[in-house]
Amino acid sequence: MAAAPRGIWEQRRLGCGLGPLARLLILAQALRLLPAARAGLCPAPCACRLPLLDCSRRKLPAPSWRALSGPLPSDISSLDLSHNRLSNWNNTLESQTLQEVKMNYNELTEIPYFGEPTPNITLLSLVHNLIPEINAEAFELYSALESLDLSSNIISEIKTSSFPRMSLKYLNLSNNRISTLEAGCFDNLSDSLLVVKLNRNRISMIPPKVFKLPHLQFLELKRNRIKIVEGLTFQGLDSLRSLKMQRNGISKLKDGAFFGLNNMEELELEHNNLTGVNKGWLYGLRMLQQLYMSQNAIEKISPDAWEFCQRLSELDLSYNQLTRLDESAFVGLSLLERLNLGDNRVTHIADGVFRFLSNLQTLDLRNNDISWAIEDASEAFSGLKSLTKLILQGNRIKSVTQKAFIGLESLEYLDLNNNAIMSIQENAFSQTHLKGLVLNTSSLLCDCHLKWLLQWLVDNNFHHSVNVSCAHPEWLAGQSILNVDLKDFVCDDFLKPQIRTHPESTIALRGVNVTLTCTAVSSSDSPMSTIWRKDSEILYDVDIENFVRYRQQDGEALEYTSVLRLFSVNFTDEGKYQCIVTNHFGSNYSQKAKLTVNEMPSFLKTPMDLTIRTGAMARLECAAEGHPTPQISWQKDGGTDFPAARERRMHVMPEDDVFFIANVKIEDMGIYSCMAQNIAGGLSANASLTVLETPSFIRPLEDKTVTRGETAVLQCIAGGSPAPRLNWTKDDGPLLVTERHFFAAANQLLIIVDAGLEDAGKYTCLMSNTLGTERGHIYLNVISSPNCDSSQSSIGHEDDGWTTVGIVIIVVVCCVVGTSLIWVIVIYHMRRKNEDYSITNTEELNLPADIPSYLSSQGTLSEPQEGYSNSEAGSHQQLMPPANGYTHRGTDGGAGTRVICSDCYDNANIYSRTREYCPYTYIAEEDVLDQALSSLMVQMPKETFLSHPPQDAANLESLIPSAEREPAAFPTNHERMTENLPFSQRSSEIFQRPLWNMNRELGLLPFSQQPVLESPELTERDPNCSSPVTCRRLHDHAFDFSRTRIIQDGTEGT
């Protein structure tokens, strides 16, 4: 039998002097070790503590370890050879159960080999040795290895060949000299690796996608030399849950630095040099729950920083350089439960900054400078309805107002330690449910306002946990408030400053000077000082004047006045201003005065005059600046009634400062005004929109059939912009104008009095403007009597000519004489009145570049000149300049050129003695054609006029029988009008009309029936005539002029 282990014999020897119970325990231990002793497998240098074979700290020479070469106890699964100064290992072990080997704190330079147990080993710890590299061959025999700890060696790099393919789960390479990580160095471990520790190395850069470890859950890179983390650095770590990068000196995290870490819950970045928090580097961290960033240099939190990590439950930003918490600092963190902002430099907390933290339970604001949040009753903590713990120690708080903790209904623990609190208003803690209060101050002002605190501390059982004593009045100085009698809390004076004059809110224009005044009084001689704040931030380098004087108010009082002067205010000066008056006994805060800086609007873009075709898109630009930003609105012709708006053709693009009118129509033409308005004032800019339209027929052209001797009225109602010029031709040739031909409404009506057979034929109405020309045909059929057959005329019409039909109507001699007299009166009146008829003045018309002018060979409009001008059809117009100090008015209301001889004399001799005055004007926007025609009829030489009863002015439609006024298809030529109806059939219908319908069509006006003879001076020399032939003038006559009133009004309207 093998000898028993030395330990067992020693226990037996020591047990001889022990009691029965001790000997029994020793015997049990000996029996437990007996199987191992019997097997002879526990070597002398080691201790068997099943399942551990502890051979650590023996410090034996190498030959002493040969005893381990034999079989090991069967129950041994762990072997510890740490702290033995082993430099190599050449011994092979015999064990089927060995799984863990520790050889820490030795001097090994290579990976040891243990012989038979090596393939079964799952844990190998070689901490603090001298291994310089990782050799894949050494690990090929460790087929079952799951945990490898090589920390504190001298490994300098990890190569792609460092590890063989193995099922390693835990790898610790911390505290080495690793500076290089080759791409793909961990690829052979990608199927199993869960934990990697690379702390305390010399890694300065992490190559992108170096960690292709889809199962890795924990990665530590603490205490390296990483300064910049590039985007996509950690891509491939799909399962990572925790990343620790403390103490690296990281100064920049680029956008997408942690992209791909979709399952990460914990990120530790303490003790680095980060200066801000923004959503760029937080992108992709949607499952993040804990973020630790203390001990950095963070100065700012971007408004949308937490957009991609809204599951945060704990955020540590302590020991940074935050000076302000803006309103949007914590937007999106509705699940946050713990927030640590301690040991920063916070002096400004925006109103409502915590309103998004509805689930916050712990808020640590220790060692900042936010005394005003408690003293100014700003309700800075509103919205924290779940907060249970609030730490405010070390914030220089001097007073606690009644509204300081409004909104903290769930607050249970409040720490106000290390604040020299002097006053606490009554009911300051009434909104809370405090169970713990930490308060330590010896600066209390024990006056009547503090009497309530004593009883409140006792009632809530806080008198044992607080240390509060009085500093004033002097006879109570140093006494605990718990020992002061209630009758000693009196108010004999007002030591703390009291604000008497608050600064007032002001609205000022940009560039003016603004003055804000604040006045406080105190009964103490303690010096007072004032600081001004803008939006809760202290103002430096501003112009402040302070005045102090004594005044009598319930005794002597010190009055302190502070004046803040702001010169040439700008928009950056807008905000809420407040003065804070402080003396030895505390501070008082004035009301906040709002300064608003306005600026009158000024145009950046003004609309330009625009000329455009119908159907196109009109685009008017208008933009203005001012403060506040002016509102842009549009008017048309001084009103807001837009035809385009009613028809949903108007579009306003606020972002582009553009006003669109789609599918422009004639009714859109006018003056458009861009109005820029804000509370400081308004201004407007005008632009003229001119709409160009090709000539068109407003009413369809209709053929005419009249009885010989009747009056024929041919209508050519034209539309277009600018208003088109009209010319008439007959049978594709010039129209020979006689004393029976009259033109009205700018040649839109051709009136033939006492129609004869020679007047029958094809009349062409040719209208043209700057955009084009349009023509239409009217066929006039003159029949000899209403009962005559018109078949012959039909045949002549088909040959494109007119055949004289009918017989000469014998007119009574008296009617002929009457007709002659009326004709003389008409000529006399027209010459005397010398009505102003003009062509539309196109001098100032702005045309698109693609429209050449028909008045000038150079493509531009020609200046109107004195003399004669030829139209496109070959007719003539005599253009007269202003004379006798009078200016002729055009259709647009401005000055225009007077037309003496119009196109009615096509191809005629313009110097002929038979040349007659022919009115020429354009129709205005109102349709005055009906009125103009009725007025003009009084000038027609027809003896039957004298016997017609007086009547009012008739409309133009009265000249046309009702059957002819029916709307018809718009005819462009005569062939279209007569395509389906033979001329013989139509002529037969026309011939049925009685001869006396002429009077019914004319609709005559009343006039004087006294005969008027032509004066001998009617014919005289006209100096403006270019021909030596005498020109005929019309002079005034003595009969009733009321008959011409309608046509005069119509002329002025054009």
Curated annotation (Swiss-Prot):
Keyword Metal-binding part of the UniProt annotation: no
Protein name (database record): Leucine-rich repeats and immunoglobulin-like domains protein 2
InterPro entries according to UniProt: Cys-rich_flank_reg_C, Ig-like_dom, Ig-like_dom_sf, Ig-like_fold, Ig_I-set, Ig_sub, Ig_sub2, Leu-rich_rpt
Record's subcellular location: Cell membrane; Cytoplasm
Residues linked to a glycan: 90, 120, 172, 188, 273, 440, 467, 513, 570, 588, 686, 727, 1024
Membrane topology: Single-pass type I membrane protein
A UniProt-annotated Pfam family: LRR_8
Record domain Ig-like C2-type: where: 497-596, 601-690, 695-784
Modified residues (Phosphotyrosine): 905
Membrane-spanning residues: 807-827
Annotated source species: Mus musculus (Mouse)
PROSITE patterns assigned: IG_LIKE, LRR
Matching Gene3D superfamilies: Immunoglobulins, Ribonuclease Inhibitor
SUPFAM superfamilies per UniProt: Immunoglobulin, L domain-like
Encoding gene (name): Lrig2
Domain LRRCT stretches: 442-493
LRRNT domain boundaries: 40-74
Keyword terms, alphabetized: Cell membrane, Cytoplasm, Disulfide bond, Glycoprotein, Immunoglobulin domain, Leucine-rich repeat, Membrane, Phosphoprotein, Repeat, Signal, Transmembrane, Transmembrane helix
LRR repeat windows: 75-96, 97-118, 120-141, 144-165, 167-188, 192-213, 215-236, 239-260, 263-284, 287-308, 311-332, 335-356, 359-381, 386-407, 410-431
